[in-house]
């Protein structure tokens, strides 16, 4: 695993600051991402004043938009606020994003994306990366991706996260776009080998440790999203198998550490829903899973003190770890 990196994928409605602090308890090695945020939202909301916390080290902000000047305007504030990297979303296939003329549809406009990269590079000293797809529609050629890389790498982007599927616009939901277009790891590898001086990270469908181990040696690293969200303890498998960290961390410990972060916010008026909603899958694949979800739901629904999560009593169980093998 020397020189290999694992990234937590940006997930809208999920990778907020509370979730990132939760994830950092589970792993010191994973690189963190914000949710996707449009340049307009960054400029006109309190996101522009968010200061990166010390425990969020190696935090990348993912921006979306199509106006180079707005990217440049955001970039300086982002650098001043302590982020480590700026990532451009050139891969989201949702109808809303397409109507806003950003995301995956910008694969058709490589020169415009290159202008966005150039404007960021002129405005700050942070590295710039791009998250994108192999292509658009049902054609499996790589011409669109090659054109995007050729233009943007000259502009200053030397790092790409490749979701190894095409994006199907105007017809498939984001969820179906993660399932119906077939995974093409070999095509992603062809792209990696074509550009020897550029970093490439594999994304898409990486949901067991053997699959990650089989693929990571060919790339500079991997990006994992929903598997970690649905099964956060999978990060402990990653820590053990990829980083050699054999420390045992219990769920009780995770809860107690998270409360050190969450309790002061709760006392200042933060909702227990916003603070606890990312913890529902903590007991994934155990006999305590349903009991835990019901317990957590009761605390949130009745607006109870979040300290009550310390009172949860696990069922006697043996974890089913077949999904990790």
Regions found by a protein language model. Give the residues of each.
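Flavin-dependent oxidoreductase catalytic cores
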Residues: 1-325
């Amino acid at each position: 695993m020397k020189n290999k990196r694992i990234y937590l994928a940006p997930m809208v409605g999920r990778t907020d600051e509370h979730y990132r602090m939760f994830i950092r308890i589970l792993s010191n090695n994973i690189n963190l991402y914000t949710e996707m945020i449009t340049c307009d939202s960054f400029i006109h909301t309190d996101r522009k004043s968010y200061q990166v916390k010390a425990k969020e080290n190696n935090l990348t902000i993912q921006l979306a938009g199509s106006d180079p000047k707005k990217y440049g305007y955001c970039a300086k504030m982002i650098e001043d606020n302590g982020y480590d990297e700026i990532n451009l979303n050139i891969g989201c296939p949702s109808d809303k994003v397409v109507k806003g003329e950003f995301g995956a549809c910008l694969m058709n406009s490589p020169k415009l994306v290159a202008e966005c990269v150039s404007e960021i590079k002129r405005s700050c000293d942070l590295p710039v990366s791009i998250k994108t797809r192999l292509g658009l529609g049902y054609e499996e050629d790589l011409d669109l991706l090659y054109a995007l890389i050729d233009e943007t790498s000259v502009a200053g982007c030397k790092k790409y996260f490749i979701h190894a599927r095409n994006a199907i616009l105007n017809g498939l939901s984001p969820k179906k776009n993660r399932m119906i277009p077939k995974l093409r790891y070999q095509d992603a590898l062809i792209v990696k080998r074509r550009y020897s001086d550029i970093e490439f990270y594999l994304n898409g469908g990486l949901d067991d440790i053997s699959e990650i181990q089989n693929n990571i040696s060919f790339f500079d690293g991997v990006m994992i999203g929903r598997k970690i969200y649905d099964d956060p303890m999978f990060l402990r498998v990653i820590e053990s198998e990829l980083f050699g960290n054999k420390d045992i961390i219990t769920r009780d410990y995770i809860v107690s550490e998270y409360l050190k972060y969450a309790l002061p916010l709760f006392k200042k008026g933060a909702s227990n829903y916003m603070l606890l909603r990312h913890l529902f899958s903590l007991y994934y694949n155990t006999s305590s899973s349903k009991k835990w979800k019901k317990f957590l739901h009761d605390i949130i629904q009745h607006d109870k003190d979040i300290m009550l999560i310390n009172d949860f009593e696990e069922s006697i169980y043996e974890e089913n770890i077949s999904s990790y093998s």
